[in-house]
Each structure stands twice: as structure tokens, then as C-alpha cells.
Swiss-Prot record:
This is Probable transcriptional regulatory protein CBU_1566. It comes from the Bacteria. Keywords: Cytoplasm, DNA-binding, Transcription, Transcription regulation. Belongs to the TACO1 family. The lineage of its organism: Bacteria, Pseudomonadati, Pseudomonadota, Gammaproteobacteria, Legionellales. It comes from Coxiella burnetii (strain RSA 493 / Nine Mile phase I).
Amino acid sequence: MAGHSKWANIKHAKARQDAKRGKVFTKLIREITVAARLGGEDIDSNPRLRAVVDKAFAANMPKDTITRAIKRGAGSGAGDNLVEVRYEGYGPSGVAVMVDCLTDNKNRTVAEVRHAFSKCDGNLGTEGSVAYLFKQRGLITFPPNSDEEKIMEIALEVGAEDVTTNDDGSIDVTTLPEDFEKIRNAMKAADLNPSHAEVTVLASTEVGLDKDSAEQMLRLTEMLEDLDDVQNVYSNADYPEEVL
């Protein structure tokens, strides 16, 4: 057993922002457009596009909206002025934070990101200052009372990296990014339906927070995710049970 699930930390940090559906849709449409521009409109041959379309469906975005965003990115050059940039820094209690952005003005974006850090007892770092503390992985989470033995069996058969059973009975299966689709499809083929599945960024080690620091870290996350240019915020914060 290993505490609460990785998705519990990710989900809680995103919960307040996800309530602002209009802003969430705007960010997803931007990401869909860029993914289609860079990799084409065929979801089967564009893993990045497939991943963000899955997120869009999970957020209850209408299919027509998704299709229009894909067509716009693949056909019209929409999103050509957007560049990807990642900022790294430290939050309260030395929590490592990475901020992924899509922007048409890096000077504006870095100023806004720096302001959020400074307002929440943090500071913006240099490139590479915290990236080594994270790794990109597929994360497939199953709810409590799932068939642990069957999940473990399939995971071993198809080459999952790790399987962890959490205190609440949920199960996390982690994969290499390139194996994510194969393993998720194998689970579904075995009638094992995850409550959540995505390629994300996971911390190699976590920093435990007390209640005050956790609230401050959540404030920083909310301020960052409220910025139009910010797509994702990752941290190695381990939130206490009382705020989850």
C-alpha cells in the first residue's frame, strides 16, 4: 500500500480550475489545434492529439467542437503563432513546480508566471532547475474494488512499469509513454475500465506538506492555471489527507 493515489494529488490540484469550464475548453481547444498542426489530424497516428482529445471528451466537450478544432489546426495554419515553453520553479516549502505553456508572447507569459510564484512564497527558477525531479509516464487509475489480481496479471503481460495499490483501494498502473495506448487498450479488452487514464508528468520524489503549505501550494496552482497561456502545472507536492 502506498498512501493516496498519484491521481488524487493531480486531481485535487486541478479541481478548482476545472470548475471554470469555459477556460478549460479554451485551453483544450488551443492544445488540440497545435497538436493537429504539428502531427496531423489522424488521431491513430498522432498520440499527442489522441491524448488531448481524450481529455476533451472527459471534460464533456462537444464532439463538434473537438472536430472543428482539429480541422482548424490541420488545415488553416491556426496556432502557427503559438510556441511551447516550460517554466520551472519552487513553491512553498521547496515544492518543485513545472509550468507548461502555449503562448504567442513569451515576455508576457514569463512575467505572469513569475508574479504568481512571488505571490505564493515561491520563486521562478532557471531551465533545468527542477525538471530532473520529474518523469513523463502513462498513468492508468482503477477505482476501489477493482480486480487487483486481474489488473496485475494484464500489467505484467503487456509490460507496465509499476502497479501500486493505494490506501483507499484504488490502483495505479504506470507505463512508459510509448506503451500507454497498448496497455490501456489491453486493460479495456479485459473488461478492466479505469476511472482515469492519461500520459502525464509524475514526480520521482514528493515533498510532504502541512495544511498551511498545502493551501498555499493550491493557491499557486490555481493562480498559474488561471493564466490563459498556461496549459498544465506539475508539482511534487504530497498533499495531506485533510485537504484531499
